Each structure stands twice: as structure tokens, then as C-alpha cells.
């Protein structure tokens, strides 16, 4: 297996680099550069170790350069962003992540982390936590161990344990504070307890004295995803006022704001934002789908929408939403036999989605499968996710059938 072979070689490189560092070899800096130069591997973690090494030998300026260059590739990386802030804090004596490659215990702890991470990716969470606990014993003050353990507990529905760890992580620095706040909100939503996730994150966001563009973007996304569309637009706009088209956030922010505008029926603004998002980053399957489907629903640009959706389907194969949109475009073009094939596949991929089942029912009706169409419409009425507007439409079709012009 090529992947296993490559991972093994990477572990060998890490071991070699840490060995040079442990013995204070003159080649240590060169070894770190070799380790982090492989473009096929996410080397953000080892960029941290490289910068941390340079800082430990008094080369703070070089350490900062490594961090800045790495953040261009991995702008949201947690450990690098916190390290950058730690180095800016002149009063800080102890860094938030304690790692010393001249300490054999710390080096061994990192290899236990590599094993733990590999086990977690294979959904072997108990084994992952076993290796993490060994790593934490050898290096108790390295936050990556806590982050992975909290994720493992979350994935195994041990929400209280996960939340307790995130609360501890949140006290370790401003980047960790916001990261932990977002994770705790996810837990609160899962728990369905009295504590309001919206209020919780609002209170946490308010405590950040000068939110950066990423924190503003995260908060805007959270508001949009919780149907607070007008509020989200305010924060998306704040981000857009601080960045240009070259910033990697630009297509994400214009997409997010475009969706929010569409949801409050400000279509011209929505369309402009979605087009701007695609202008900068044309390979976004879900943005292509959102814009095309919106056009189809308005009865405009349907042929163009179909081409966009076929492109989206090439980028993101077997996605139920995209396949449904292709079927719906064909339906609107009165290509009913083709539409039925796509909509049938969409239902197989997303059997509990009310809109997709409704579309398939319409398609069956237009292909003269009237009994089967009624079966699917009745099924839509029995789905608890079906909103009132769709319920009314389906009830009308059950009484009078599907009008070919609709």
C-alpha cells in the first residue's frame, strides 16, 4: 500500500529530525526544512516544531518567519496561530504548548500522538485514547493531545467528558478560547439542554476584544446556520471590508452572505455575491448548485443552470442535492424521462429529504406513473422535516394532480 509506505517514510523523517534536535546537531534546522518541504503532506504541525526549535535556540526572528510562511498555507491552523500570539506577548515566559526536542519524553510523546491520530482516523477511539494517555503522561502540557482526546470523546457520544476538556483548552490562549467555544456550542446543540447555543456563542464572542477576520467569519457562519440571516450579513460584510479577492476567505464569505441574502429574499444582492464567489473560485460544487437551483426555481437561466450543475456533478460525484438539481432542471425543460432517472437516483441517495421526494413524485406524475407519484407525495406528508409551505403544495397535488406548467 503506497499510503502506508509513505506514512512510514514520514515517521522515519520525523524520527531522524527529532534525533538531530535531541543531540543538538548542526543539521537540525536543515532536517526540519526537509521534513516540512514535502508538498503532498500537511506539514503544519512540524512547521510548529521547527519554529519552536528555532525559538528555543534564540532565533526568534527566524521562528516568526517560519510561522508566517506556514500560515500562508494553513491560515486556520490552531497551534501555529496560538504560537504566533504567544511570541507577540513579551510578558509570556511559558508558551501554551510545551515541547522540547532535547527532552526524550517529549519526543516519545509525539510518536504516541502520531499513533493516536492514526487510530482516531480509523475510528478506533479507545485505542487512540490509550496512546494519548501515554503521550499526556510523558508531556502533560501539550494541548494537541487534549484536542484529539476531546474529539474522540465527542465522536463516541461522551459529551460531558468532551465538554470538560474543551473548557480546559479554552483557558490556554485566545486562539484556543475561540476554538473551544465553537466545539462546546456543537456539544450544546447535540445535548438539547436548556442552555441556548446562540446565546452561549454570542457571550463568548463578545469577550474577544478585537475579533480577527476568521473569528468574525466563524461567527457569521454560525448565525447563518441558525437562521439569523440579517445578523450574519452584518458580520460577513465586516469581513469583506477587511479583505480583497486574493484572500482565501473571499469566496467563502461571498458564498455565505449570498445564501443569507437569498434566504431574506434580497435576490439581486444574493446573485451578485454568489457570482463573485464563483468568479474567484469557480470549482465550488455547492455554490454552483445553490446558484443554479435558485435560478431554476425562478424559471430563469435553466439551460445555463443545467451546464453548471453537470460541472458540479463532475466535481462532487453522487451528491444527492446536486443530482436532484440536475433532475429538476431537466424537469423544468420538460425532459421528463431524463429527469426521472436523475430524481430516482437522488431519492436513493437521500431517501428522507422532503423536497427531493416531492420532486420525484412530480416526475413520476409527468411520466404517467400516477399511483407511484401519490405514494411519494403521501410519504412527504409523513416526514417531520416537511415545512408547511411544502405540505400545502403536496396536499393540493394529491387532490388535483400535478399541473404540467408548474
Name these PLM-found stretches:
Residues 1-164, 171, 175-193, 211-228, ...:
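Alpha-helical solenoid repeat scaffolds
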Residues 37-38, 72, 136-137, 170-171, ...:
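Conserved structural position within tetratricopeptide repeats
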Residues 297, 304, 315, 332-334, ...:
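C-terminal soluble interaction/assembly domains
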Residues 97-102, 305-309, 315:
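Flexible internal linker/loop segments at domain or repeat junctions
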Residues 32, 67, 132, 166, ...:
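Hydrophobic/aromatic packing residues within the alpha-helices of TPR/SEL1-like helical repeat arrays
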Residues 268, 289-290, 307, 328, ...:
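Feature representing long, continuous alpha-helical segments
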Amino acid at each position: 500500500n503506497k499510503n502506508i509506505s509513505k506514512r512510514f517514510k514520514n515517521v522515519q523523517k520525523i524520527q531522524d529530525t527529532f534525533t538531530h534536535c535531541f543531540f543538538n546537531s548542526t543539521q537540525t534546522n536543515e532536517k526540519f526544512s526537509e521534513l516540512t518541504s514535502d508538498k503532498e503532506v500537511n506539514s503544519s504541525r512540524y512547521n510548529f516544531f521547527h519554529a519552536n526549535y528555532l525559538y528555543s535556540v534564540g532565533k526568534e526572528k527566524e521562528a516568526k518567519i517560519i510561522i508566517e510562511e506556514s500560515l500562508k498555507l494553513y491560515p486556520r491552523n490552531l497551534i501555529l496561530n496560538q504560537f504566533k500570539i504567544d511570541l507577540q506577548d513579551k510578558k509570556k515566559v511559558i508558551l501554551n504548548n510545551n515541547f522540547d526536542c532535547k527532552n526524550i519524553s517529549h519526543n516519545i510523546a509525539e510518536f504516541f500522538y502520531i499513533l493516536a491520530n492514526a487510530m482516531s482516523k480509523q475510528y478506533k477511539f479507545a485505542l487512540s485514547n490509550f496512546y494519548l494517555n501515554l503521550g499526556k503522561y510523558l508531556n502533560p502540557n501539550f494541548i494537541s493531545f487534549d484536542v484529539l482526546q476531546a474529539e474522540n470523546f465527542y465522536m463516541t457520544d461522551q459529551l460531558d467528558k468532551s465538554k470538560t476538556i474543551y473548557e480546559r483548552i479554552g483557558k490556554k490562549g485566545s486562539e484556543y478560547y475561540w476554538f473551544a467555544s465553537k466545539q462546546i456550542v456543537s456539544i450544546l446543540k447535540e445535548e438539547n439542554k436548556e442552555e441556548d447555543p446562540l446565546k452561549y456563542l454570542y457571550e463568548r464572542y463578545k469577550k474577544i476584544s478585537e475579533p480577527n477576520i476568521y473569528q468574525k467569519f466563524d461567527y457569521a457562519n454560525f448565525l447563518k446556520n441558525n437562521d439569523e440571516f440579517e445578523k450574519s450579513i452584518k458580520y460577513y460584510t465586516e469581513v469583506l471590508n477587511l479583505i480583497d479577492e486574493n484572500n482565501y476567505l473571499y469566496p467563502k464569505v461571498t458564498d455565505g452572505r449570498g445564501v443569507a441574502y437569498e434566504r431574506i429574499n434580497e435576490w439581486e444582492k444574493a446573485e451578485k455575491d454568489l457570482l463573485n464567489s464563483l468568479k474567484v473560485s469557480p470549482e465550488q460544487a455547492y455554490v454552483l448548485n445553490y446558484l443554479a437551483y435558485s435560478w431554476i426555481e425562478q424559471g430563469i437561466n435553466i439551460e445555463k443552470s443545467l451546464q453548471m450543475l453537470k460541472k458540479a456533478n463532475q466535481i462532487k460525484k453522487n451528491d444527492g442535492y446536486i443530482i436532484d438539481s440536475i433532475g429538476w432542471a431537466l424537469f423544468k425543460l420538460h425532459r421528463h424521462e431524463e429527469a426521472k432517472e436523475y430524481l430516482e437516483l437522488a431519492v436513493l441517495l437521500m431517501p428522507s429529504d422532503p423536497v427531493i421526494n416531492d420532486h420525484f413524485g412530480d416526475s413520476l406524475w409527468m411520466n404517467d406513473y400516477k399511483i407511484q407519484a401519490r405514494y411519494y407525495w403521501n410519504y412527504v406528508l409523513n416526514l417531520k422535516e416537511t415545512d408547511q409551505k411544502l405540505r400545502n403544495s403536496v396536499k393540493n397535488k394529491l387532490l388535483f394532480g400535478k399541473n404540467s406548467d408548474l
